[in-house]
């Protein structure tokens, strides 16, 4: 059973079932609060009927002109609630919000080029690889950096689908070429 | 004002700005701050009504709302009014709905449900689910409930039609179960059956159904779920879906058949077989293996003392459970529920280093430090005094003091009004966290026991007036629910509450101010009152004794006589010997806890008496000074005996390990487990080494 709920700062005390997972980063206070301060409607969670948080989405809106877009910063689902469509629910809502009220052209996210599971999932959601950001994920001591795929999905405002391209896996850019 | 969380100050400042510079932004700030005051605990009932009214009267000055956040603010203010009419009217207004805002949508449904306007609840939920195509369980639930309340054929038909159309979605199927539960047990059974047939392969199936299933015929339900367990090839080649159905079925057995003596044996045998399954072999390293829950269930079954086919002696129970869980952990490195239990159980038997290893594997950091560090650091100064994990946990509170007020200001500036109240509460809860209070006290005690410098560790006695906030999560431990006492049973003493913190703050303050007579008396009196009037359930017996001993010391400082010192010596030694009694059978957190408190109390006693003698110089009666010297000598003797006993325990370690390995290996339950991934003898040896480390620290304390 999944209900979507807006996220508030006090929910940070309740995300343990999600954040104890090895893949989920625990950010410092400033990171979470800055998202709540700037993009409150893009930070939301899913709950089970016991009121326990089972997943959450941290999103933001950024860019200028035709680069104005929604962005998936962090999507995390508790281990017991995986493979039941929660990620889809969270991403769908971010897309909805990015279209209205943010009126963005597209949504994007960064994913490790080796993360076949996540890439496959987002492709099922209609995302495609826009470009390969070489060495985006820094390894320890600057060695073994890993590439990221910048994956995108055009929204209603992008009628001509200018925000996506074919064969993005081979379109290489450097991290400094990526807007903040 | 944001920095000090002063809501009154915020309101006054905002009001001044709004009057001096009637800008829209300052009017909004005034409304926000009035709202914050109205919902705070710093105002009287009359003030609450006043600020609510003030906020609602300012709303027209900023209409129409320019952002969804302003609309949320208006809704929050309208929530404060005595009746819900204006709130509902505003939330259901198409102009409000056009904001497409989750906060407003949530408030809308909540307000309608609270008002009992079931027609509107039904229609709103139907719009969400069917028209907007948003699959929200809360909407499903309220629509089903509204249909039942209304008893209206048209709406009931519409509900049933939608349920049938969406029965293959998880929310839809579960909504069907919920709706059936409002009808009859028979209907609930059929709906739950349908759900499990379609979704039993999902890990969450058990959690989704358990509250409904508890009302059903247990045997009938268990027979059904057992029928769902099938394997295309064999159990040893089970796929992920097949494993999930199997484990979910076992979870229902755990829930509904608590007297099954064969439960643990069956779970262990199933787990062994599943280690060769595709589900286990093909999983990513960062995925969890759901089969681990078979072991966790077996572990918690044993810990609860439920029936088993071959009994386990009490002295070996926790170690047996540790072996079960270590087996699961060795096969599945990232399973946090296993590691949390291991952290708790190792601490329970006083093997801190092993607990630390599993705790570190969880990579708990930032806000989690406040919520989860108690799993490792509860009473750490008296289990295995350790500095590094204790100090690193305190960083979050320093960060909160800076970051949260900064971001509250940002929220005012950016107009994210839906977040102000939450951020203010967040900041307050961290600032007044009882865990923070505990860690402050523990840091001082650890430093004392380890002989470290105490500069910078002073505790402000004013802190004891804090309304301590409880943020700790005790329910994340598998098998622990508000109704269960399992987590309670294996906790490191009673939960340390605000009373515990206040008592220990007073204790530390008395120690710090021991030579300043008026302050010492003031805090001693406060401690005495606390011990007499407050609920002391959060203190262990030996902690209470230690506090009472300090009060006696304070009396000695006031008026030391030969007889007084002699009486103090007698009661102190009696208490020390009582609480330091060596357990021959097995070590536990309780024994270490008692020993460390006894030694710490001895330390404080001797230091205090020495300080008094130093202050008195030659002015005091020589007989009193001599009686103090005798007292110190008696205390030292007891401490020496404690250290000697600790040494003997250490020297008997090899025998303890051999005896333990022999006993454990002969347990029938363990013989059934595939322990090829762990070395039992090495594991037990490490338990012993962990306990020995605590013994070593104890023996190295300097009185």
Task: Enumerate the language-model features and the residues they cover.
Chain B
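Compact beta-rich and alpha/beta scaffold cores in large eukaryotic transport/transcription complexes
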Residues: 267, 273-281, 285, 349-445
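Short coil/turn connectors between adjacent alpha-helices in alpha-solenoid helical repeat scaffolds
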Residues: 2-7, 36-48, 213-220, 253-266, ...
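Residues within HEAT/ARM-like alpha-solenoid scaffolds
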Residues: 5-12, 22-30, 42-53, 65-69, ...
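Non-catalytic protein-protein interaction scaffold segments in large eukaryotic complex-forming proteins
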Residues: 71-239, 505-662, 666-669
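Internal alpha-helical scaffold/solenoid segments in large eukaryotic proteins
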Residues: 1-18, 29-33, 68-161, 293-297, ...
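Extended alpha-helical scaffolding regions
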Residues: 389-532
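Long, acidic/serine-threonine-rich intrinsically disordered regions with weak helical/coil propensity
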Residues: 176-298, 307, 406-416, 420-423, ...
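Solenoid-like repeat scaffolds
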Residues: 16-25, 56-66, 90-101, 126-135, ...
């Amino acid at each position: 059973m999944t209900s979507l709920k807006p996220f508030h700062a006090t929910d940070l005390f309740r995300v343990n079932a999600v954040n104890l997972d090895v893949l989920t980063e625990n950010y410092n206070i400033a990171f979470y609060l800055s998202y709540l301060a700037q993009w409150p409607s893009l930070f939301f969670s899913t709950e089970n009927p016991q009121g326990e948080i089972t997943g959450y989405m941290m999103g933001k809106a950024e860019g200028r002109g035709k680069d104005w877009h929604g962005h998936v910063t962090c999507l995390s689902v508790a281990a017991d609630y995986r493979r039941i469509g929660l990620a889809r629910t969270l991403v769908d809502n971010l897309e909805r919000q990015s279209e209205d009220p943010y009126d963005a052209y597209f949504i994007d996210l960064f994913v490790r080029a080796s993360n076949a599971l996540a890439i496959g999932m987002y492709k099922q959601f209609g995302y495609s690889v826009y470009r390969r950001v070489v060495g985006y994920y820094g390894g320890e001591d600057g060695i073994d950096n890993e590439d990221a795929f910048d994956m995108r999905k055009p929204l209603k405002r992008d009628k001509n689908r200018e925000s996506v391209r074919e064969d993005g896996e081979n379109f290489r850019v450097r991290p400094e070429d990526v807007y903040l | 004002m944001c920095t000090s969380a002063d809501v009154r100050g915020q309101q006054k400042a905002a009001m001044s700005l709004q009057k001096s510079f009637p800008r829209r932004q300052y009017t909004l700030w005034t409304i926000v701050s009035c709202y914050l005051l109205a919902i705070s605990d710093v105002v009287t009932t009359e003030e609450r009504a006043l600020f609510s009214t003030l906020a609602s009267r300012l709303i027209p000055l900023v209409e129409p709302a320019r952002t969804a956040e302003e609309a949320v603010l208006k809704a929050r203010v309208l929530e404060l009014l005595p009746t819900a009419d204006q709130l509902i009217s505003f939330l259901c207004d198409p102009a409000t709905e056009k904001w497409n805002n989750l906060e407003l949508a949530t408030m809308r449904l909540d307000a309608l449900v609270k008002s009992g306007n079931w027609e509107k609840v039904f229609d709103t939920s139907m719009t969400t689910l069917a028209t907007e195509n948003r699959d929200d369980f809360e909407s499903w639930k309220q629509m089903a409930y509204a249909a039942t309340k209304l008893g209206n054929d048209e709406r009931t038909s519409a509900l049933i039609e939608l349920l049938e159309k969406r029965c293959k979605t998880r929310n839809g199927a579960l909504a069907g179960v919920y709706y059936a539960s409002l009808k009859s047990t028979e209907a609930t059974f059929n709906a739950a059956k349908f759900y499990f047939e379609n979704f039993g392969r999902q890990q969450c199936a058990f959690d989704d159904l358990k509250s409904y299933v508890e009302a059903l015929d247990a045997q009938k339900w268990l027979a059904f779920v057992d029928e769902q367990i099938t394997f295309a090839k064999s159990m040893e080649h089970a796929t992920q879906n097949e494993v999930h159905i199997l484990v979910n079925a076992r979870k229902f057995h755990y829930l509904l058949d608590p007297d099954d003596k064969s439960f643990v044996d069956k779970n262990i045998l199933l787990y062994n077989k599943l280690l060769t399954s595709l589900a286990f072999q093909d999983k990513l390293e960062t995925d969890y293996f759901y089969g681990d829950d078979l072991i966790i269930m077996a572990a918690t079954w044993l810990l609860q003392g439920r029936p088993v086919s071959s009994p386990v002696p009490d002295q070996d129970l926790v170690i047996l459970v540790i072996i079960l869980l270590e087996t699961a952990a060795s096969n599945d490195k990232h399973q946090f529920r296993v590691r949390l239990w291991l952290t708790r159980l190792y601490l329970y038997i006083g093997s801190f280093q092993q607990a630390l290893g599993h705790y570190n594997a969880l990579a708990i950091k930032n806000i989690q430090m406040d919520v989860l560090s108690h799993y490792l650091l509860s009473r750490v100064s008296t289990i295995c005094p350790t500095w590094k994990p204790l100090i690193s946990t305190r960083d979050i509170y320093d960060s909160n003091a800076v970051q949260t007020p900064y971001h509250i200001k940002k929220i005012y500036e950016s107009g994210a009004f839906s977040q102000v109240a939450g951020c203010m509460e967040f900041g307050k809860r961290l600032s007044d966290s009882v865990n923070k209070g505990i860690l402050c006290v523990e840091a001082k005690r650890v430093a004392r026991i380890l002989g470290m410098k105490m500069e910078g560790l002073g505790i402000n006695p004013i802190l004891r007036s804090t309304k301590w906030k409880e943020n700790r999560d005790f329910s994340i431990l598998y098998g622990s629910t508000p109704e269960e006492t399992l987590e309670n049973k294996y906790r490191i003493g009673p939960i340390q509450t605000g009373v515990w913190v206040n008592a220990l703050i007073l204790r530390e303050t008395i120690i710090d101010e021991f030579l300043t007579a008026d302050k010492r008396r003031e805090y001693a009196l406060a401690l005495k009152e606390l011990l007499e009037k407050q609920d002391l359930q959060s203190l262990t017996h030996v902690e209470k004794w230690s506090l009472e001993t300090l009060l006696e010391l304070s009396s000695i400082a006031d008026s030391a006589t030969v007889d007084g010192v002699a009486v103090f010596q007698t009661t102190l030694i009696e208490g020390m010997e009582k609480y330091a009694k060596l357990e021959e059978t097995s070590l536990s957190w309780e024994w270490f806890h008692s020993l460390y408190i006894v030694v710490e109390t001895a330390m404080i006693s001797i230091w205090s008496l020495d300080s008094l003698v130093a202050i008195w110089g030659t002015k005091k009666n020589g007989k009193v000074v001599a009686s103090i010297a005798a007292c110190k000598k008696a205390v030292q003797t007891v401490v020496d005996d404690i250290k000697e006993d600790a040494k003997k325990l250490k020297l008997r370690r090899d025998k303890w390990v051999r005896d333990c390995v022999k006993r454990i290996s002969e347990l029938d339950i363990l013989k059934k487990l595939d322990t090829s991934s762990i070395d039992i003898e090495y594991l037990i040896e490490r338990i012993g080494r962990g306990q020995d480390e605590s013994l070593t620290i104890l023996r190295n304390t300097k009185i």
